[in-house]
Structures are given as C-alpha cells and as structure tokens.
C-alpha cells in the first residue's frame, strides 16, 4: 500500500483426514512474514493459478488483463490492471489509511502474543521439571499459529504455568481497566469540548446573522439616500436652468430700460414704464437672490448626503470584514471539532482492539488445562491469491 509491490497471501488450508465435524482454517499472512519453505508448502497446497490486481497509473479508461507464466512454471499469474478515478482518490486514500491502521493493530497484537510465548518458553526452560509440560506448551503455541498437523494427546498444565498466566491475565486486566478509565475521561473531556464548541459556534452564528441583518439595513438606507441624492441633483439642474432664464430676462429688462432712458428722459409715460421696469428688475433680483440662497442650501444638503453615504459605505465595509472574520473562526472551530472526532475514533478503535486481545488471551488461558486437538483434515488445493499494487 506504500507505492511499491506488496504481496498478501490468502490460503485455505484443508488438512488431511478431514471429517464432517472438523473446522476449516482460513489464514491471511503477509508475504514478508513467510519463509521460503512455508511459501513453497503453501504454493503446493494451493491451486496453480495466482490472481494479481495491479493498480495502473495510465490515463486510459480501459480495463486490461494479462496472463503471465511464473518462473518455475508451476503456477499462472493473471494480472488485472485497475484504473482509479480522480474523484475516488480521497476514498482510496481513506481506505488505505484504515487498512494501515488495522495492519498496525494486528502487528501489535502479534508482537504481544510473541512476547507472551517467549516469556512462557523462558520460564519453562528455567524450570527443571518434566519435558511433558514443554511439549504441551509447544503444542499450544503451534495450535495458535495454525501449524499443528499431527495427532496430539491431552496434557495437564503445571501449577507454575497457571500461576504465571494468571499473573499475566491480571496485569492485562489492570491495563485494560486503566485504559477504560482514560477513555471515559477522554470522552467526558470531548463532550465538554463539544458543548463549548457548540455554544461558541451558535454565538458566532447569531453574531453573523445580526451582522448580516445590520448590513442589509445599511444597504437599504444607502440605496434610499442614493435615490434622494439623485432627486436633489435633478432639482438642482432644474433650478440652474430657471436661474439662467431669469438672468437672461433681467439683462433684457436692463437693456430696454437703458434704451427708454436714452430715447425720452422727459416723457412721463416712459418714466412710469421705466419705474415699472425697475420694480420688475428689483423683484427679479430678489428672486435671483432667493434662488441663489436655495441653491446654496441644496448644495449643502447634497454634500451632507454624500458624506453620510461615504460613512455608510465605510460601515458596510467594516461589517463585511467582521463577517469574514466570524466565518473564518467558524471554519477553524469546525476543523478543530473534526480533528477531535478523528482522535476519539482512533482512541476508541485502539481500546476496542486491546479489549478483544484481552478476551482472546483469557479464553486461551482457560483452555490450557485440557487441550483436545482433532485430526488434521486432508489438504485440498485452493487458488493462491496475490494482490500486487504498482
């Protein structure tokens, strides 16, 4: 699974003299754990065909297979090239990691069993007792490895072996109890952390919702102010047009007044007309002054509205920044929560594997007193399956 070719041998062993009440043994071993003699014996008992599944890195979408003869000519190797999809890469990596962890747990259990066997063997070697007990323990160890093939008789274990085994069981039981206590403490800590994370997450979500509502309101107010500014600008344009028209009329009246004054200064009618024109000019000037004041006031209002609009935009930008920070905090908390879940699952799987090991060990120690070994059934050729990954 590490990018090179790894071999995994699956063998169905049918010993000789198989009866109706016997049990078939199915063994899964790694290629690196088998010696040359064992591989040759397994190959002779298994069939003459070997299926190899090869993961190819080619970009084609076809499924190719290849039939290859082995070097010794006693078996056939059928290679099947599997093309993985890019979308299944994450699932494939997850399965690989899970298989690696399972293999690691199996290796730890096997190492513990091997250590226990070595301890028992060393104790029996130091004991100057009868050799029958050694033969009994050797039979037990061979039975655990699945290598017992001949007829064996039942022996009773010595009291010293039972005492040592009981001590080992008690130590394993204490270790399991300590690990269970640690697991419960870790679960309680995880639950408290989860509740704290949930409270913090809900608080951040509420703050994000409130910020979004405030942002929406600010955007609505900004749109309303923009509409008001547009209306004021249209009014200013109309007032400027009216101002230009009135200014043109004033100039025309002044021109006519000067003409009348130049034509007939002594004419009363012209004087009255001139007076009327002067009054009109004065009224128009007052109107112009009033319009000028209104124009200045509207310009001040427009400047104030523009300043308010800029302030609203600054507030909106600050709200956007706050919302982005809250989203980043939420993503960070979710990532921490997922990491905590993965750690708890890993710890629970490890504790479960240790619990299964202690149960199997206790069952084996209880059966050390009386051992009954059935006759090995006759071998039956089965196919040898090898999984190759490139």
Swiss-Prot record:
Subcellular location: Secreted
InterPro entries: Tuftelin_GRINL1A/MYZAP/CCD68
Any Gene Ontology CC annotation: extracellular region
GO biological process, one term: biomineral tissue development
Entry keyword set: Biomineralization, Coiled coil, Phosphoprotein, Secreted
Tissue: Present in the extracellular enamel and is mainly associated with the crystal component.
Primary location: secreted
Disulfide topology: none
Coiled coil: 88-126, 162-351
Keyword Nuclease: no
GO molecular function list: identical protein binding; structural constituent of skin epidermis
Annotated positions of the Phosphoserine modification: 171
Keyword rRNA-binding attached: no
Assembly, per entry: Interacts with TFIP11.
Function: Involved in the structural organization of the epidermis. Involved in the mineralization and structural organization of enamel.
Annotated family: Belongs to the tuftelin family.
Protein name: Tuftelin
Organism of derivation: Bos taurus (Bovine)
């Amino acid at each position: 699974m590490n990018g090179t070719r790894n071999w995994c041998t699956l063998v169905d062993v049918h010993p000789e003299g198989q009866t109706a009440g016997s049990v078939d043994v199915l063994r899964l071993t790694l290629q690196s754990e088998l010696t040359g003699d064992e591989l040759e014996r397994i190959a002779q008992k298994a069939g003459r065909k070997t299926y190899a599944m090869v993961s190819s890195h080619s970009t084609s979408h076809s499924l190719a297979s290849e039939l290859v003869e082995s070097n010794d000519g006693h078996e056939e190797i059928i290679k099947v090239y599997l093309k993985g999809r890019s979308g299944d890469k994450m699932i494939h990596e997850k399965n690989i990691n899970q298989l690696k962890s399972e293999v690691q747990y199996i290796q730890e259990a096997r190492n513990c069993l091997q250590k226990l066997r070595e301890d028992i063997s060393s104790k029996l070697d130091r004991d100057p007792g009868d050799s029958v007990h050694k033969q009994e323990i050797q039979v037990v160890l061979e039975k655990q490895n699945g290598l017992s093939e001949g007829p064996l008789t039942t022996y009773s274990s010595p009291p010293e072996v039972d005492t040592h085994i009981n001590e080992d069981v008690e130590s394993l039981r204490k270790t399991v109890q300590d690990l269970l206590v640690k697991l419960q403490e870790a679960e309680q800590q995880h639950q408290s952390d989860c509740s704290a994370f949930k409270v913090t997450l809900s608080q951040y979500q509420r703050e994000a919702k409130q910020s979004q509502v405030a942002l929406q309101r600010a955007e609505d107010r900004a749109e309303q102010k923009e509409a008001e500014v547009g209306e004021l600008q249209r009014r200013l344009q109309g007032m400027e047009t009216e101002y230009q028209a009135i200014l043109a009329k004033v100039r025309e009246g002044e021109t006519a007044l000067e003409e009348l004054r130049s034509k007939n200064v002594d004419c009363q009618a012209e004087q009255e007309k001139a007076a009327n024109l002067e009054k009109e000019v004065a009224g128009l000037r007052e109107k112009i002054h009033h319009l000028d004041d209104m124009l200045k006031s509207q310009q001040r209002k427009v400047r104030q509205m523009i300043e308010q609009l800029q302030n609203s935009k600054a507030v909106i930008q600050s709200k956007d920044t706050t919302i982005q920070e809250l989203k980043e905090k939420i993503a960070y908390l979710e990532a921490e929560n997922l990491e905590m879940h993965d750690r708890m699952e890993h710890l629970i799987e490890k504790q479960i594997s240790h619990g299964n090991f202690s149960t199997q060990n206790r069952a084996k120690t209880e059966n050390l007193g009386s051992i009954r070994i059935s006759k090995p059934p006759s071998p039956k050729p089965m196919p040898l399956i090898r999984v190759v990954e490139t």
